[in-house]
């Protein structure tokens, strides 16, 4: 393992879990894929660092896998709600730093929140929000709900904003909103100089409360 490589574990290898594994692995991270289904584990073994058949609703299994050594653990167990909740509880009690969990509905999400899940994803709901935001504003290229009312969005600079600076947009004056960076061509500039003059086609990446982001984008 290279120093500085992030380590992720994904528990549950349905379509969602496998997609998460592949994206994380392609980004250069170290990925452990876990499922009770041997066929799914074999599929994941073709592209992740390590794939194991195991049941993470057992405390001994979680201890043996040393999940507390991982930067993040994603619990992507789909159909079995009880297994998802139990795996989350065991992971938190084992000292896992950051537990992300896929939830099927708001009731499950509330239960997961109460037992300590650090981040809850509801894929169908989140995709619906993303699509709606992009339909409402064609400048929005990506809209990612992050949970707890927060979202990250990427929007493109058009003719109305050309020649203005990042400071002129006053994004950071909106409570809770931060500019993470912007993209010009292939280059991504993190922590950008707010005096940067914008050009048509620049992508601006911001994070903040969903409602405040939406209202601010309408005003630009």
From Swiss-Prot:
Entry protein name: Ktr system potassium uptake protein A
Record-level GO cellular component terms: plasma membrane
InterPro entries, per database record: NAD(P)-bd_dom_sf, RCK_C, RCK_C_sf, RCK_N, Trk_Ktr_HKT_K-transport
UniProt-listed Gene3D superfamilies: NAD(P)-binding Rossmann-like Domain (3.40.50.720), Regulator of K+ conductance, C-terminal domain (3.30.70.1450)
Similarity section: Belongs to the KtrA potassium transport family.
Organism: Vibrio alginolyticus
SUPFAM superfamilies the record matches: NAD(P)-binding Rossmann-fold domains (SSF51735), TrkA C-terminal domain-like (SSF116726)
Keyword Membrane among UniProt keywords: yes
Ranges where the RCK N-terminal domain occurs: 5-121
